[in-house]
């Protein structure tokens, strides 16, 4: 077992701001799901067998084909909704999507990047787990093989964007703590140790480099392509190289417990607590994060609801594994309820118009001006996943 570097675990500041809140009831969660599904059904008619753009434009998604890194989240929303109500209309459309994903991997359409997990886990892995569909399994394993092509032995990580091996692209990103779950699944299905080894190596490379000593996270981290030595952490989506991009922090909060399920390394619990406490201590009054954790109330900056929704899923997952004696366990429980309640009551969509998101006020890419204070499809997915998690004993797609 490899070592994870020691990180600072902050004490949760003023835990009563969470502990004094009321837990969501099952009826409240069910009402939130029903409300979300009303918009989902409108969007099904709007998208047809196509997909939403990654983010909305003036709070309306445009329609696109299956060529973005985000398309799997739409199909994931369909599967989550199907698991809630067993509507065969949802199943049929989601399955047609899965066939589109099989075609995409067979023809290698717009797949030269690291986001194979985001594409294939909530779409194809989901269908295999729900229906045992062999085409869904075929697509998933082929996608895992494609992701394996980006593995760099020198440094032991999956390279993010760009041409493989080039110095200016020789880096990992924290997002891939979710993408490597595709490799764990491939190992689970095939028994081939190569998938698990790459996933494990990438996890440790991330834990020891992209996470700072204070448990905040860089977005990306560079390595030397000749030696594999760690070089530097920088941002691409965050405010600065020194700040902590909220969604990146949330990828860590969710990616760690997902990996802990498969690795069972106790060091991961400490890392989770460090990253989660850092996130919770920088939430504003309404408990929904700004797009970078450097900002809080009065900054005039937009929220990123997708980061908060993702963090809720991560906390919910890790509560399964935290020992009962953990002093923060009760606070985590109340914190995730408080965050999800705020999303439901203050940030969920109320206008039933074709193309509207389920969740408002997200940020796609602040520096490039894309999807700023807009809905985004991963925010919709993780919001709906969080609701389903709170509603039933749900078998993960990840």
From Swiss-Prot:
Q: Which GO terms describe its molecular function?
A: chondroitin hydrolase activity; unsaturated chondroitin disaccharide hydrolase activity
E.C. designation(s): 3.2.1.180
| Disulfide links within the chain | none
Q: Give a brief account of the activity's temperature dependence.
A: Optimum temperature is 37 degrees Celsius.
Please list the GO biological process terms of this entry.
polysaccharide catabolic process
**Which catalytic residues are annotated?**
115, 175
Outcome recorded upon mutating residue 115 to N? Large decrease in activity
Effect upon mutating residue 370 to I: Prefers unsulfated glycosaminoglycans compared to sulfated glycosaminoglycans
Subunit architecture: Monomer.
> Any other comment in the entry?
Ser-365 and Ser-368 bind the sulfated group in the substrate and determine the preference for sulfated glycosaminoglycans compared to unsulfated glycosaminoglycans.
**What biological function has been recorded for the protein in this entry?**
Catalyzes the hydrolysis of unsaturated hyaluronate and chondroitin disaccharides. Also degrades unsaturated heparin disaccharides. Releases 4-deoxy-4,5-didehydro D-glucuronic acid or 4-deoxy-4,5-didehydro L-iduronic acid from chondroitin disaccharides, hyaluronan disaccharides and heparin disaccharides and cleaves both glycosidic (1->3) and (1->4) bonds. Prefers sulfated glycosaminoglycans compared to unsulfated glycosaminoglycans. Probably required for mammalian cells invasion through the degradation of extracellular sulfated glycosaminoglycans such as chondroitin and hyaluronan.
What's the name of the protein?
Unsaturated chondroitin disaccharide hydrolase
């Amino acid at each position: 077992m490899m070592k994870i570097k020691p990180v600072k675990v902050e004490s949760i500041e003023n835990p009563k701001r969470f502990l004094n809140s009321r837990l969501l009831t099952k009826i409240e969660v069910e009402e939130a799901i029903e409300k979300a599904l009303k918009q989902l059904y409108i969007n099904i008619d709007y998208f047809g067998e196509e997909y939403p753009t990654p983010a909305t434009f003036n709070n309306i998604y445009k329609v696109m084909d299956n060529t973005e890194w985000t398309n799997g989240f739409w199909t994931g929303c369909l599967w989550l909704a199907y698991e809630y109500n067993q509507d065969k209309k949802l199943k049929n459309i989601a399955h047609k999507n899965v066939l589109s994903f099989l075609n995409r991997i067979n023809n290698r359409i717009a797949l030269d990047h690291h986001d194979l997990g985001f594409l294939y886990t909530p779409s194809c892995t989901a269908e295999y787990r729900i229906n045992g569909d062999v085409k869904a399994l075929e697509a998933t394993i082929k996608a895992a093989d494609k992701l394996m092509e980006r593995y760099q032995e020198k440094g032991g990580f999956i390279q993010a964007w760009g041409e493989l091996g080039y110095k200016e692209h020789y880096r990992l990103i924290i997002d891939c703590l979710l993408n490597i779950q595709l490799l764990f699944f491939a190992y689970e299905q095939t028994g081939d140790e190569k998938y698990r080894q790459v996933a494990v190596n990438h996890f440790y490379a991330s834990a020891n480099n992209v996470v700072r000593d204070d448990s905040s996270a860089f977005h990306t981290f560079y390595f030397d392509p000749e030696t594999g030595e760690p070089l530097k952490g920088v941002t691409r989506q965050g405010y600065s190289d020194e700040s902590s991009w909220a969604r990146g922090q949330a990828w860590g909060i969710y990616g760690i417990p997902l990996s802990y399920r498969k690795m069972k390394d106790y060091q991961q619990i400490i890392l989770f607590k460090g990253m989660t406490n850092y996130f919770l201590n920088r939430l504003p009054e309404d408990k929904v994060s700004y797009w970078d954790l450097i900002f809080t109330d009065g900054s005039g900056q937009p929220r990123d609801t997708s980061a908060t929704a993702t963090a809720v899923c991560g906390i919910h997952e890790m509560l399964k594994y935290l020992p009962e004696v953990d002093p923060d366990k009760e606070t985590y429980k109340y914190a995730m309820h408080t965050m999800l309640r705020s999303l439901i009551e203050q940030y969920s969509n109320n206008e039933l118009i074709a193309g509207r998101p389920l969740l408002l006020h997200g940020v796609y890419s602040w520096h490039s001006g894309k999807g700023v204070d807009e809905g985004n499809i991963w925010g919709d997915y993780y919001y709906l996943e969080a609701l389903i998690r709170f509603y039933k004993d749900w078998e993960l797609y990840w």
